[in-house]
Curated annotation (Swiss-Prot):
Phosphorylates and activates not only PKB/AKT, but also PKA, PKC-zeta, RPS6KA1 and RPS6KB1. May play a general role in signaling processes and in development. The gene is PDPK2P. Keywords: ATP-binding, Cytoplasm, Kinase, Membrane, Nucleotide-binding, Phosphoprotein, Serine/threonine-protein kinase, Transferase. Residues 1-53 are annotated as: Disordered. The active site is at D178. This is Putative 3-phosphoinositide-dependent protein kinase 2. It comes from Homo sapiens (Human). ATP binds at S65, F66, S67, K84, S133, Y134, A135, E139, E182, D196.
Length: 396
């Protein structure tokens, strides 16, 4: 996300800065002298505001629904940034001003090695710019698709990094609400950097608010409480963590169907299968995270927080104190990669060779009345209609 705002052209509702974040007109705002400062003390000089011409823009790193992320080199320092660029006119037209403001404000609160860092913001008459740390190795999802599934050592290491990041984030009173492999980037040294905070929620300490009441997220990782109660909590991120651990081992998320409606039905009924060769300790961890009752998930406040989660047998060999200084393991495939032709646009695929264990708990869905699309018509990522999909045999 990016924001910009000039004195002459400022989109309504986009502040120039905030107390907790960098001002939109350049680097972080300088603190004002306090009441006890000398009468004639001069404020420190403000750094020159950054402008687009200060950078050489290169390849496109990613494109969202209303933003583009471009690799840029600062001419004065030769330092590389991922600069998120967004047109003011578009965000106003699409009512995305709160999204942009939220991302800026949340990222300005974070100072942790496992999160993308916001270095500066600036703007011109037409565009907003966020200067972000450059995660050179791209999305975690890319490696899941390339490798197929991670071996136990890799699964443990990257799961531990995500747990460490969530512990920090939740300690700040922030819910991510859209945690998924696409939003977990890998930097040059192969450490994770979590990104995309446009749908994040900062909980209010005054009201002791523990939930965020709006429907956001991605179908395969949405928690059941968001579907039944229309609200998310810190424990909703732990549900997403369980889905990600499953995907690291199996290569696909646990809840898959021909369309979002059917995916939601499976989530609410807790219907998913474990492959026969799923690591036993990882399986136990996933089962303790994919729990319908948000207050019973391992790691949530009602279950004594992150201590019991980090003490789970799956993490027995993990040294938590210096994860960001440990050498990441070489990515090693547990099972071969799946062809894109085997997966539809919802991650749905037929897996022969499974000894399916169906987990079916909870009442049927009562809160969703939308008519489901015809499940026989499934669009693949390459735009074809496939009925049925070609079966994948990579788990045999």
């Amino acid at each position: 996300m990016v924001r910009t705002q000039t004195e002459s052209s400022t989109p309504p509702g986009i502040p120039g800065g905030s107390r907790q974040g960098p001002a939109m007109d350049g680097t972080a705002a300088e603190p004002r002298p306090g009441a006890g400062s000398l009468q004639h003390a001069q404020p420190p000089p403000q750094p020159r505001k950054k402008r687009p011409e200060d950078f050489k823009f290169g390849k496109i790193l990613g494109e969202g629904s209303f933003s583009t992320v471009v690799l840029a080199r600062e001419l004065a320092t030769s330092r590389e940034y991922a600069i998120k660029i967004l047109e003011k006119r578009h965000i106003i037209k699409e009512n995305k001003v709160p999204y942009v403001t939220r991302e800026r404000d949340v990222m300005s609160r974070l100072d942790h090695p496992f999160f993308v860092k916001l270095y500066f913001t600036f703007q011109d008459d037409e565009k907003l710019y966020f200067g972000l740390s450059y995660a050179k190795n791209g999305e975690l999802l890319k490696y899941i698709r390339k490798i197929g599934s991670f071996d136990e050592t890799c699964t443990r290491f990257y799961t531990a990094e995500i747990v460490s990041a969530l512990e920090y984030l939740h300690g700040k009173g922030i819910i991510h609400r859209d945690l998924k492999p696409e939003n977990i980037l890998l930097n040059e040294d192969m450490y994770i950097q979590i990104t995309d905070f446009g749908t994040a929620k900062v909980l209010s300490p005054e009201s002791k608010q523990a939930r965020a009441n709006s429907f956001v997220g991605t179908a395969q990782y949405v928690s059941p409480e968001l579907l039944t109660e229309k609200s998310a909590c810190k424990s909703s991120d732990l549900w997403a963590l369980g889905c990600i651990i499953y995907q690291l081992v199996a290569g696909l998320p646990p809840f898959r169907a021909g369309n979002e409606y059917l995916i939601f039905q499976k989530i609410i009924k807790l219907e998913y299968d474990f492959p026969e060769k799923f690591f036993p300790k990882a399986r136990d961890l996933v089962e303790k995270l994919l729990v319908l009752d948000a207050t019973k998930r391992l790691g949530c406040e009602e279950m004594e927080g992150y201590g019991p989660l980090k003490a789970h047998p799956f993490f027995e060999s993990v040294t938590w104190e210096n994860l960001h200084q440990q050498t990441p393991p070489k990515l090693t495939a547990y099972l071969p990669a799946m062809s894109e032709d085997d997966e539809d646009c919802y991650g749905n695929v037929s897996w022969p060779g499974w000894r399916a264990r169906q987990v079916a708990l909870g009442p049927p869905c009562t809160g969703l009345h939308a008519r489901a699309p015809d499940p026989r018509v499934i669009c693949s990522r390459k735009g074809r209609v496939s009925v049925p999909l070609r079966q994948a045999c990579w788990w045999l």
